[in-house]
């Protein structure tokens, strides 16, 4: 079974843990409890393939920055999360993406831009088109709006990253085996 190392990044309070726990355990975490680092494992089926996801739920961008390079070095796919109710959390993501590309030393990194808390439409300050435009600027990276509370697009975030990783690095052993003939 193929393993995938996914990293959830973004400012404090955007709902990184809520999305991760909703995906892994099917529970909405109401209370805000700042994360230092939590790791979760979940087996899922994506496009008929069994996958083991290892999801690293990280501290907000303003904390524990020394650990961030290590997450980025080891991660294969990244969910960059902002809250649609806080412009500053959206603005923080540009530097985060640049840091990922610098650490990975490539522009071709599986990334999904996630506008979380889309259930709070009355409190929206970051328009959906702002997210779409930023995703286009980022080499047309994937973009979704989500809500951990309302279970909107939660699974899709992680499944999309798995699909991006599969496109970038196809499953080994899928190629047709060459047959050889030996004369003795």
Curated annotation (Swiss-Prot):
GO terms for biological process: Rap protein signal transduction. GTP binds at residues 10-17, 57-61, 116-119. One of its GO terms (molecular function) is G protein activity. The keyword Lipoprotein applies. The keyword Lipoprotein applies. It catalyses: GTP + H2O = GDP + phosphate + H(+). InterPro entries: P-loop_NTPase, Rap1, Small_GTP-bd, Small_GTPase, Small_GTPase_Ras-type. The modification Cysteine methyl ester is found at residue 181. Residues 182-184 form a propeptide. Its main location: membrane. It is found in: Cell membrane; Cytoplasm, Cytosol; Cell junction. GO terms for cellular component: anchoring junction; cytosol; plasma membrane. It comes from the Eukaryota. Belongs to the small GTPase superfamily. Ras family. This is Ras-related protein Rap-1b. It comes from Cyprinus carpio. The lineage of its organism: Eukaryota, Metazoa, Chordata, Craniata, Vertebrata.
């Amino acid at each position: 079974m193929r393993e995938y190392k996914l990293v959830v990044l973004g400012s404090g309070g955007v709902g990184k843990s809520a999305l991760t726990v909703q995906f892994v355990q099917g529970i909405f975490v109401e209370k805000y409890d700042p994360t230092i680092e939590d790791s979760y494992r979940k087996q899922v089926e994506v496009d008929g393939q069994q996958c083991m996801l290892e999801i690293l739920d990280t501290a907000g961008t303003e904390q524990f920055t020394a650990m961030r390079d290590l997450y980025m070095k080891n991660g294969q796919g990244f969910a960059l999360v902002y809250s649609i109710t806080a412009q500053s959390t959206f603005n923080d993501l540009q530097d985060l993406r640049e840091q990922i590309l610098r650490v990975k030393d490539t522009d071709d990194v599986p990334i999904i831009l996630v506008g979380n808390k889309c259930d709070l439409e009355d409190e929206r300050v970051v328009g959906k088109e702002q997210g779409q435009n930023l995703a286009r600027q980022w080499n047309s990276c994937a973009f979704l709006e989500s809500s951990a509370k309302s279970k909107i697009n939660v699974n899709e975030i992680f499944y999309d990253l798995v699909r991006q990783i599969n496109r970038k690095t196809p499953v080994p052993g899928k190629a047709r085996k060459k047959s050889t003939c030996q004369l003795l």
